[in-house]
Amino acid sequence: MKAVWKGLFTAVALSALPLMSVPASAAGTVTVANATDAGSWDPIDTFTLDWGRVGSNIFDALIQRSNDLKLNPGLALSWTISDDGKRFRFKLRPNVKFQDGEPFDAAAVKFTFDRLLGPDGSKGAQQSNYTAIDHAEVVDDMTVDLILKQTDPVLITKLAGYGAMIVPPAYIKEKGVDYFRTHPVGTGPFKFVDYTPKVSLTLAANPDYWGGAPKLDKLVYRFISEAATQVAELQSGGIDVASLVPISLIDTIKSDAKLDVVSITGPTVNSLRFNVQSGVTKDPLVRKAIIEAVDRDAIIKQIMQGNAKPIASLQSQLSFGYDPGLQRTPYDPAAAKADFAKAGLKPGTPIKISIIGDDQTFREVAQAVAGYLQVVGFAPSLSPSEANTYYTDVIPNGHTGELFEQVWGGWTFDFDNTAYLLYHSGQFWNPYIKDQKLDQMLEAQRAIMDHDKRQAILRDIAKYISDNYLELPLYNSNTVYGINKRVKGLDPAPDDRMRFQNASVE
C-alpha cells in the first residue's frame, strides 16, 4: 500500500500520537441559538449546518478538519491507500470509549459504514456522498479497511463529514434507531443529557474525552427560528451565541458593549436555481433574461453590507475546482428586456420564487430580485416555506416555483460535492435537471485521481452550467455570529461547525 495525499493533503499518510486526556476545571454553561431543530441527531439523517453545530460536539469521525481547513487524524491515527485507489486502511486511536462506556474499535467503524450504506442510510441525506464505498472490513481490533467500488478522489475529505461520524453498535442495537435519533451517543467532547423537540437540547461535558476534557460543564442549544428573536435574546442574556444574525441587525449588536460580531468567510454560497422542466424558465432565453435583470453587486453592497463576495458558479474561492477566470453573466437590464420580448413573454408574466421563510436576510435579497424582475416585465411573487419542509419536500419533490432558493455549505471544499448532488440526474437535490452531457462530465471527474485533470473537468462543469443558464449564482455569504464577550476560546470555523471543546466562560 502507498500513502496518497494531494492538494490540501500532505505527501504522506498522516499520523499522530494518542492525545492524553488532561483534566480541566469544568465550569459554566454556554447557551447557543440554532435556527432549526434537526429532529434527528443520527449523523446519517442530516444535511444541515444547524445539525453540525450540535453534532460536531457529540460525535467524532475518522478524520477531523481543523479551523485552518487542514485534515488531521481524528479517530483514525493514520491511513494508507492502495495503488489502485480502492482500499483505504485506517489505524485507529486506542483507548477511546463512547460516552456510554462502550469501547471504540474497528467493529464500530464497520457497523457505522454498514448502516450508512444500508437500508437505514438510504432513508437519509448522507448515503449519496459515500456510494463509492462497497463495504468495510475489520483487519484487527484497531485496523479497518474501506473497500471501494470505484475510486473517489474526495473520500478522505468526506470522511470528515457528518455522515461518516462513528456511532456505537451495542447502544443502537439495544435501544433501536428511533431512540438513538433523539438520545445520541458518540465519542465527542460533550454527551447528551436532554432533548425537548422544537425547544432545546442539552449536553454535558465528557470528562473522559480522548482529546481532553472540555472547560465548560454544559452546552444548551435553544431552537429559535426568528433572527430578530435570536438577537433580542442575545442582548437580554437569554443566549450567549446567536447563529442567525440578519445583516440589518449587525450594527445593533456592535453597539452593545457586552457583545461581539464575528463574520467568517466560508464555503456557503447562495443562489436562485431554475425549474428547467416546466413553466417559462424551461426556456434558456428566459433564464438568461432573469440573470441579466438582477444587479448582484448592488445586492452584495446594499443588503449584505459587504458580508459576501460575488460568484460566477455555486462555489466559493475555497473550493477545489473554483475558476477565477469564469465570468458572470453581466447585469444588463436593457438586454434582459430584449430577451424577455424575444422569448415571446408578455408584460405581467407571473413568476414564483420559492424561499426559506425564516431566513430574514435572504427574504430581503429575494424581494430585491423580485423588484429587478418586475422592471423587466415579470409579475414576481415570493413563496416561503418552513426550513425543514423546504429541504425535505419542496426541493427534492419538485414543489418549487420557477425560481427557488438554494443555500449550499460546500462542506468538502470540493466542487464535486456541490455539482454532483445538485446537477446529476436523479439526485435528491436535483428535481429538474436531466442532462446527459452534464452527467457524463460529473461521472468522469469522480473516476480521476489526477489533481490537474480533475480540476479542469470541474471548471468545464461550472462553465457549462453558466453557459446554459441553469442557475443564478448570487454570492458567497459570510457566516455572521453574535457572541457574548463572556464566552472565551470559541473560534468559529469556516465550515460553519461550532466546536466548544476549548471554549470557556468568565
Predicted regions and their residues:
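Extracytoplasmic/peripheral linker and loop segments enriched in polar/acidic and small residues
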Residues: 285, 381-390, 417-485, 506
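Alpha-helical secondary-structure segments
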Residues: 31, 105-112, 141-147, 188-189, ...
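Ligand-site clamp/hinge motif
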Residues: 178, 206-252, 379
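Surface-exposed binding/hinge segments that line
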Residues: 91, 128-170, 194
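N-terminal lobe/hinge region of extracytoplasmic solute-binding protein
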Residues: 33-83, 114, 185, 482
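Structural transition elements
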Residues: 309-342, 359-364
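Gly/Pro-rich hinge or "lid" segments in bacterial periplasmic/extracellular proteins
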Residues: 160-214, 218, 228, 334
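Ligand/substrate-recognition segments at binding pockets and active sites
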Residues: 32, 197, 341-410, 425-426, ...
